[in-house]
């Protein structure tokens, strides 16, 4: 008899930058779990702008630091992948968009977790579906619509 896939989330958080006010591992676990269908093996690495820029250039061909990068490895039997989050970009965006910082971290974690599960926003229909899913997940946790700017 084949074992059923696990619903367990094994989440590691790597704090590779010195920045006050970063979310705790427990926050990332809550946000990631809310977006995850089934189980997962995920690492979230918080990086400085230099590392974020280097990774974005290497993997996406864009020479700037971005808010979150997703590196999916597998979806069966559990989701496996890495998220790279750049706190300096997240903080700047939250301030510019007049969003609570915690809500922006929650949104980007959910967004990244959906990418790890195969969601994308390569065309308008996919983007709308992904945004709707993000809104639903975030609302269930009590966060505002991240796209109502």
Curated annotation (Swiss-Prot):
Top EC class of this enzyme: hydrolase
Gene3D superfamilies the record matches: Metalloproteases ('zincins'), catalytic domain
One annotated GO molecular function: metalloendopeptidase activity
Cited PROSITE patterns: UPF0054 (PS01306)
Cofactor annotation comment: Binds 1 zinc ion.
Main localization, broad class: cytoplasm
Co-factor(s): Zn(2+)
List of residues binding Zn(2+): 111, 115, 121
One GO BP: rRNA processing
Entry keyword set: Cytoplasm, Endonuclease, Hydrolase, Metal-binding, Nuclease, Ribosome biogenesis, rRNA processing, Zinc
Location(s), subcellular: Cytoplasm
NCBIfam families, per database record: rRNA maturation RNase YbeY
Similarity comment: family membership: Belongs to the endoribonuclease YbeY family.
Function: Single strand-specific metallo-endoribonuclease involved in late-stage 70S ribosome quality control and in maturation of the 3' terminus of the 16S rRNA.
Protein name: Endoribonuclease YbeY
Gene coding for it: ybeY
């Amino acid at each position: 008899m084949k074992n059923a896939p696990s619903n367990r989330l094994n989440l590691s958080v790597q704090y590779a930058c010195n920045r006050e006010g970063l979310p705790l591992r427990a926050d990332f676990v809550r946000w990631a779990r809310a977006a995850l269908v089934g189980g997962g093996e995920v690492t979230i690495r918080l990086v400085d702008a230099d590392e974020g820029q280097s990774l974005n250039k290497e993997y996406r061909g864009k020479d700037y630091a971005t808010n979150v990068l997703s590196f999916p490895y597998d979806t069966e039997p559990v989701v496996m992948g890495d998220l790279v989050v750049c706190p300096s970009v997240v903080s700047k965006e939250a301030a510019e968009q007049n969003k609570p910082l915690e809500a922006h971290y929650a949104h980007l974690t959910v967004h990244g977790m959906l990418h790890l599960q195969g969601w994308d926003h390569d065309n308008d229909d996919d983007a709308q579906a992904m945004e709707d899913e993000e809104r639903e997940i975030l609302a269930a946790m009590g966060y505002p619509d991240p796209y109502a700017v």
